Amino acid sequence: MPSSFDLLGEMIDLLQTEQLTSYWACPLPNALTKRQDLWRALINQRPALPLSKDYLNLEDTYLDDWRASFVPVSVKDCQKTNYTSLFLYHGDIRYLAVDAIVNAANSELLGCFIPNHGCIDNAIHTFAGSRLRLACQAIMTEQGRKEAIGQAKLTSAYHLPASYIIHTVGPRITKGRHVSPIRADLLARCYRSSLDLAVKAGLTSLAFCSISTGEFGFPKKEAAQIAIKTVLKWQAEHPESKTLTIIFNTFTSEDKALYDTYLQKENNCE
């Protein structure tokens, strides 16, 4: 069985042979972490074009090994709140073994092309595997236009523990700018569209990231309030959806503190 070190070397060689990215001539590193970074940079930058069977087999083995390196987090491992069907999970959304996780996408819906970028879109696309970008490309080709803010699309999660990924594009807020009612409503639409799609797909568990609060600059406090209020209102309007368990995933300590506070009924997100 080839090691991760060797698998990375073979994948890097195949990707560099294509000469599709600015990293095609970089020398092969001798350190594991450097190889991981180079492979990720190559696959992040690679256009949504078909891949060879040889590469896909190597990537499948490598990502299967990655998937086996941690214990997935299920709903029962998540923190309970004062709302029966709402849970909290503080950590890496890629580790959640739920029916679907929500990805904060961009309007191209093809993932992040910035090498080794720290956004959730990059992390999800990298470790779901390159088939995800190809699946998203197929959706965008059929759609024939950029993805609108507040809509939602469903794909397989491929190598992630989750079964599916729901992709939604949130609104951007310029730093220091007030959150307008229009942008607040657009963020709420992201949650409603994702919930509607989850029910349509027959899902029973859905994990939301903090949409728009990263690279898109939406203030965390307002975003948390909108997220929780929107989900609670949607649940009240869809009593048939009681079987859908909803998880709010937080990654920063600030987000965790906000959701911990707002998911106590007496605070009511005010």
From Swiss-Prot:
Primary role: ADP-ribosylhydrolase that specifically reverses the SirTM-mediated mono-ADP-ribosylation at an asparatate residue of GcvH-L (SpyM50867), by releasing ADP-ribose from the target protein. May play a role in the regulation of the response to host-induced oxidative stress. It can also hydrolyze ADP-ribosyl-glutamate bonds and ADP-ribosyl-cysteine bonds. In vitro, it can remove the ADP-ribosyl modification from the human mono-ADP-ribosylated PARP1 E988Q mutant, which is primarily modified on glutamate site with only minor aspartate contribution.
Name of the protein in question: Protein-ADP-ribose hydrolase
Cofactor binding note of this UniProt entry: Binds 1 Zn(2+) ion per subunit.
EC number: 3.2.1.-
GO MF, one annotated term: hydrolase activity, hydrolyzing O-glycosyl compounds
Entry keywords, A to Z: Glycosidase, Hydrolase, Metal-binding, Zinc
Highest classification ranks of the organism: Bacteria, Bacillati, Bacillota, Bacilli, Lactobacillales
Named cofactor requirement(s): Zn(2+)
Binding site for Zn(2+): C112, H117, C119
SUPFAM superfamilies for this protein: Macro domain-like (SSF52949)
PANTHER family for the chain: ADP-RIBOSE 1''-PHOSPHATE PHOSPHATASE, GANGLIOSIDE INDUCED DIFFERENTIATION ASSOCIATED PROTEIN 2-RELATED
Quaternary structure (record): Monomer. Interacts with the lipoylated form of GcvH-L.
Limits of the Macro domain: 73-267
Family: Belongs to the MacroD-type family. Zn-Macro subfamily.
UniProt catalytic activity: 4-O-(ADP-D-ribosyl)-L-aspartyl-[protein] + H2O = L-aspartyl-[protein] + ADP-D-ribose + H(+); 5-O-(ADP-D-ribosyl)-L-glutamyl-[protein] + H2O = L-glutamyl-[protein] + ADP-D-ribose + H(+); S-(ADP-D-ribosyl)-L-cysteinyl-[protein] + H2O = ADP-D-ribose + L-cysteinyl-[protein]
InterPro entries, per database record: Macro_dom, Macro_dom-like
Native organism: Streptococcus pyogenes serotype M5 (strain Manfredo)
Any one Gene Ontology BP term: protein de-ADP-ribosylation
Pfam hit, one: Macro
Sites where the protein binds ADP-D-ribose: D92, I93, N106, C119, I120, D121, S212, T213, G214, E215, F216
Top-tier EC class: hydrolase
